[in-house]
Amino acid sequence: MAASFEKKHPVLAVVGPTATGKTALGVALAEQFGGEIISADSMQIYKGLDVGTAKVTPEETHGIPHHAVDLLEPDQTFSVADFTALAGTLETDLSARGKLPILVGGTGLYVQSFLYGVRFTAEKAPDGLREQLAAELAEKGPAALYEELKQVDPEAAAAIHPNNQVRVLRALEHYRATGRRLSEQKAASLPPERPYRALVLGLDFPERAQLYRRIDLRVDRMMEAGLLAEAETVFANRVRFKTAAQAIGYKEFFPYFMGESELTPCVEKLKQASRNYAKRQLTWFRHMDGVVWLDAAAPDLKARAAALTQEFITKG
């Protein structure tokens, strides 16, 4: 694993909140620059969760290979550390074949862990701990977890910027898993911040209302594409499909399946949950260093992104 952190292969990332057109831009850049896509979406790794995760369709791929998609059954677990290892293997293979690895997705923890080379504790974490921490981050926000870190490991907290959520989670994971402070480890054991030469393109809209309209429209289209049936499958298997059962796009319909709500309020709840999630995504990516932000609605978006990518590759 240590060798992978010494690589300086070029990696492109297309990030941002949901419904900003990341997939289409990633595919366009892959076509132009000979790239392949590595999905950085925590739910698209699962088979059968297609509509609710806005998984890329065969038509939308334009023949570009997409990796880290449809690899696991919904009852299997997949952690941030698992993704980092998988993405590292994929990057090595793609670079060896002369392909540009293009990371596309909105799971900020995945993107930041891979690009910035954050290692998680080598000791096996208790089952579900990483998922629990990720859920706490989404529910409570980064400030609350940073405050917890200050209480249990003030030395580590002092050395970590509050906005570096990946390292905050890593430190908390280490403490909860081992009962020991991360600050007790030698600094030499920590990996360098950025293992790859990366260009990170972020997509957003100038007006928040425009993003929200796009999200609402996407939910309506998901309903037309069969989201309700997919959510019913998750509901029927909710004990086994623990991760999916907590995911936005499925849990909002459980009251309907239990006869506790009409369908329309569930759809509206999903739209609101998606808007809230988009705000959290924006907060995460706005705190990431080096993101080049682009107007997702700009007529010259693809041309602008292509120019930046060409400059990035040429400078290599």
Which residues does each PLM region occupy?
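Phosphate/pyrophosphate-binding catalytic cores of soluble transferases and nucleic-acid-acting enzymes
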Residues: M1-G316
